[in-house]
């Protein structure tokens, strides 16, 4: 039985207790050997070749490798302001589109709304403009019911100003539903006769090592397709620096825990404080139980400095709107938890009526009501949004592109319609067998 309440004291237990409702409540409140893609750079433009392909990864030490559909391994790293000339090839047996989550203002590259799914064996070329620095995520966008799960690939865009950290580490958390034969059930299918399995960067136990007093930037990504997850770094001061790729006013993570909706990202700073050999467990909670998935270890190297850095200032900004004047905002309602007027990706047609149309330069307020029986996750393409307070008299001090909404709950979000074009809206229920559903909106 999972206890509903606060996390257990680190001194009392190596575990922390959360229910599924705890995860959702916390989310609402807070809301490496690199393998590089083929790239050629010239005058701020970079040619990038990405292939959606069948791959295999070893999830169990003594078990068979698991087939996955991926864009390759390792982080994709570029600089803010670059324009990527992307060649996307589909080597999968089904149609696919490239979905890069969190990249605002790229309407010509928008999957489904602007670019149809690519047939097996075909190629497509388009541009991606990297307007913002931050942590993003790329994956093939498929219809549910595929024969293998998707293995996403982190996209890291660095800023033009240096950030005072000694290590910059990506931690991609993935959830698998493994059959006894080692194959994995993709989301959108009944996970019967399977075992939930979690990895960080493809490993069941992931270690990060750093000298004493080193400052680390840890970029946590929830690569699970359906589950809200909590990650806890025990006995560490965890400072949240960015959410969903956008800098936030730094704040301490409550009890050292982060709650991540499917596809969401949170960047934190931690200091490797303590003598050599000190170990800080990394725990993962899926709403049912907590399990250790890694640790941060203070290495035997000499301390990198006599004492840890003082608290960090905010990360350099991405020129997001300083204010949103909601008095003249366009207001729309969007129902979640129901398939009405939503489409599976394979059934989506750009000729379908948009969920809403907004005028460029005008603020937009969306009222989201979850009419389903379980939590539903909304992903807004093209623009980041603010989560509004209950009375629309303010907003949370961070930007989001992904939001989980509890059953029966209503949330309001607001954004400035900056980038003309057509963009997707996604919703997924937090159930492995639930389909991904999409609609679109336009900015004119």
Model feature map: region roles:
Residues 1-18, 26-32:
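N-terminal secretory signal peptides
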Residues 36, 41-53, 147-178, 248-375, ...:
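Extended terminal and domain-junction accessory segments
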Residues 61-77, 196-207, 339-360:
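N-terminal edge beta-strand
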Residues 81-82, 122, 130-136, 213-214, ...:
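Short tyrosine-centred short linear motifs in exposed loops/low-complexity segments
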Residues 88-92, 221-222, 368-372:
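Asparagine-centered strand-capping/turn motif at beta-strand->loop junctions
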Residues 107-120, 129, 173-175, 180, ...:
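Histidine- and aromatic-rich segments of cupredoxin/plastocyanin-like copper-binding domains
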Residues 130-158:
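Hydrophobic or amphipathic alpha-helical targeting/insertion segments
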Residues 235-247, 371-398, 430-434, 440-444:
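Active/binding-pocket-proximal capping segment
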